[in-house]
């Protein structure tokens, strides 16, 4: 299925690219999320007429994401208290939702889908470096300090 991208999509392309994707991916994800439209003659003409407006909107979103990434980097570190055993292992784990809630409580709005844990959930006490993907092009890093609850 031919589509026109309205936003940058990982592994596909950027604004204005006409790409061929599987129909289910287009129907169930790209079109409902507002990231693409089917490449009909009407949509191609409509896109070309609004191209400057869409590019300005995309630049605005990117600037907002960069500002949020700077705020995350400025935090330095966030402390999360969790129940732990004697050897420093947690009862359970600290996942993306816990980290997103802690960062949001510290003053920077972050959703759990923006938190990247390459080695899986955190299961030990101590300092852990966590990556955030605020936008497809914008990344931030933050130290998460996990301490045992008293």
UniProtKB/Swiss-Prot annotation:
Family, as annotated: Belongs to the bacterial ribosomal protein bL9 family.
What's a BP term from Gene Ontology annotated to this protein? translation
Q: What keywords appear on the UniProt entry?
A: Ribonucleoprotein, Ribosomal protein, RNA-binding, rRNA-binding
In alphabetical order, the GO MF annotations are:
rRNA binding; structural constituent of ribosome
One short Pfam family name for this protein? Ribosomal_L9_C
NCBIfam families linked: L9
Q: Which organism is it from?
A: Photorhabdus laumondii subsp. laumondii (strain DSM 15139 / CIP 105565 / TT01) (Photorhabdus luminescens subsp. laumondii)
The record ties this protein, via Gene3D superfamilies, to: Ribosomal protein L9, C-terminal domain, Ribosomal protein L9, N-terminal domain
The name under which this protein is listed is Large ribosomal subunit protein bL9
């Amino acid at each position: 299925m031919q589509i026109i991208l309205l936003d940058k999509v990982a592994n596909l392309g950027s604004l204005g690219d006409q790409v061929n994707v599987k129909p289910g991916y287009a129907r169930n994800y790209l079109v409902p999320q507002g990231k693409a439209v089917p490449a009909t003659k009407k949509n191609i003409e409509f896109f070309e007429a609004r191209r400057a407006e869409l590019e300005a909107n995309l630049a605005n979103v990117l600037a907002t994401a960069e500002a949020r990434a700077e705020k995350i980097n400025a935090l330095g570190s966030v402390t999360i208290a969790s129940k732990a055993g004697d050897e420093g292992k947690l009862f359970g784990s600290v996942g993306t939702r816990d980290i997103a809630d802690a960062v949001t409580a510290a003053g920077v709005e972050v959703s759990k889908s923006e938190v990247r844990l390459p080695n899986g959930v955190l299961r030990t006490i101590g300092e852990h470096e966590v990556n955030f993907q605020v936008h497809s092009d914008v990344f931030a890093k933050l130290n998460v300090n996990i301490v045992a609850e008293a």
